Amino acid sequence: MMAVHGIKHLVLLGLGRAHIQVLRGLADIRPADLHLTVIAPRPQALMSPMVPGFVAGHYTLAQCQMPLDGLLERSGAHFVAGSVAAIDAHAQRVTLASGDTVAWDWLGFAARWLHVVT
């Protein structure tokens, strides 16, 4: 989905700290001219301060993960469970490992995705 009648499509790849902040901000304002899609393996985030405790055996991996279903709903995001296989910057399209594609007007992604940009 690209811009239709003034509506822009923002696609966020992953649920890291920066994207969680974006979702929090959008949950407060819910712009009518924005369609939001989040692509990540699961609707949860790893709480990085707990990783040392996980490595030391004090926490399970499940205890280190924060569910984000509520935040996704409040922000109006459409959640897509998947991983990215390619980002075509020229065509403004993300291809998922499943073969599905998602078009975007604006794209948010972490540096770890640079290896799939064409």
Residue ranges and their predicted role:
Residues 1-7, 76-118:
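FAD-binding core/adjacent interface of flavoenzyme oxidoreductases
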Residues 2-78:
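Beta1-alpha1 glycine-rich phosphate/pyrophosphate-binding loop at the start
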